[in-house]
Design a protein with these regions (language model features):
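Alpha-helix N-cap/loop-to-helix initiation residues
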Residues: 67-68, 97, 162-165, 236
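Short cysteine clusters
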Residues: 18, 22-25, 210, 230-231, ...
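Hydrophobic pocket-lining residues within nucleotide cofactor-binding pockets
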Residues: 94-96, 159, 188-189, 243
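Conserved alpha-helical substructure of the radical SAM core
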Residues: 1-112, 122, 126-134, 138, ...
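Amphipathic alpha-helical recognition patches that constitute DNA-binding helices
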Residues: 1, 9, 13, 155, ...
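Conserved C-terminal portion of the radical SAM core fold
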Residues: 9, 13, 52-60, 81-88, ...
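C-terminal accessory region of radical SAM enzymes
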Residues: 138-141, 145-153, 174-202, 226-227, ...
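N-terminal [4Fe-4S]-dependent radical SAM core
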Residues: 1-11, 53, 199-207, 213-216, ...
Length: 292
């Protein structure tokens, strides 16, 4: 188990809200109080990354980033301070518009993931009832228009929860290809049993390791500055520290963080409970079918 002095990737919320109410997501059942990250904490995160060996910033975490009306300005601050860092964004596409997309095209975004969980109106509404189907597809075509000639990798993501007709995937893939996007069909992930309506029916008392190496490479920061052990911790039960009072580096190499890692990666110690519930644990035989 090797851990660098500073995370390679940082994933964080500038706020904690989402409008989509996806049936495959825990968000609507969590009862979160609305939180917005203070500008001071946001700038502290970015400023502490300067001159560090960080490869990617992901300014979203279990939320819809474009609900933040200052999100473009925040992306501009990231790009100004860290001109070489990769920036990844995932969105349900509903709060974009032509002006925002034009501004986005100027920021050298590395990867833009479009969560579009149904091709037809009916299936899209079933999967994402809080999102306007027509607006999403219009915005997707605008993204193709303005980002098509940039270096940004744009992909449409669908989640296969075994309830979606095959024709939905076929037609969405055609739409993606027509617009020059990649198409990703990912397996359903119940977020370590945080999704109420569906389940992977998985629990492993002998969990050891993480298929995606996130505890060794990626830090996750909530809108209030708290650092959680993993993005699957929707209930915020495993807090490693708070960026408001400590530095990224001091939290990352802290005794508490390292104890969690040791418990997860040891064959003899008891893994954190959240990891036992997660199909991305190293010992899970089906994790190769899930990309997330």
């Amino acid at each position: 188990m090797r851990v660098t002095r500073f995370p390679k990737i940082i994933e964080f919320q500038t706020h904690n809200r989402c409008n989509a109410n996806c049936i495959i997501c825990p968000y609507s059942s969590m009862g979160y109080k609305s939180e917005k990250m203070e500008d001071e904490i946001f700038k502290k995160i970015i400023d502490e990354c300067v001159d560090k060996r960080i490869t990617r910033l992901i300014p979203y975490l279990n939320n819809e980033p474009f609900l933040d009306k200052t999100f473009i300005q925040k992306l501009s601050y990231i790009r100004k301070k860290l001109p070489q860092v990769e920036i990844e964004i995932s969105t349900n596409v509903s709060f974009l518009n032509e002006n925002l997309i034009i501004e986005l095209s100027k920021l050298n975004i590395t990867e833009l993931r479009l969560s579009m969980f149904g091709f037809t109106y009916r299936m899209h509404h079933i999967m994402m009832p809080g999102v306007d189907h027509k607006k999403v597809f219009e915005n997707a075509e605008l993204i193709a228009k303005y980002l098509g000639n940039t270096e940004c990798k744009v992909s449409i993501v669908m989640i296969d929860n075994k309830k979606i007709p095959e024709s939905e995937f076929v037609e969405m893939k055609k739409f993606a290809q027509k617009n020059g996007f990649d198409f990703c069909r990912w397996g359903f992930l119940d977020r370590a049993k945080n999704v109420k309506k569906f389940s992977n029916n998985y629990y492993d008392d002998t969990a050891s390791g993480c298929e995606q190496r996130r505890p060794l490479e990626r830090m996750h920061i909530l809108a209030d500055g708290k650092v959680i052990f993993c993005c699957q911790d929707w209930a915020h039960e495993n807090i490693m520290g708070n960026i408001g009072t400590d530095t990224i580096e001091s939290i990352w190499v802290s005794e508490r963080y390292n104890n969690y890692r040791k418990c997860l990666y040891s064959a003899t110690l008891d893994a954190p409970e959240i990891c036992k519930r997660c199909v991305l644990s190293e010992s899970c035989g089906i994790n190769g079918k899930i990309c997330n």
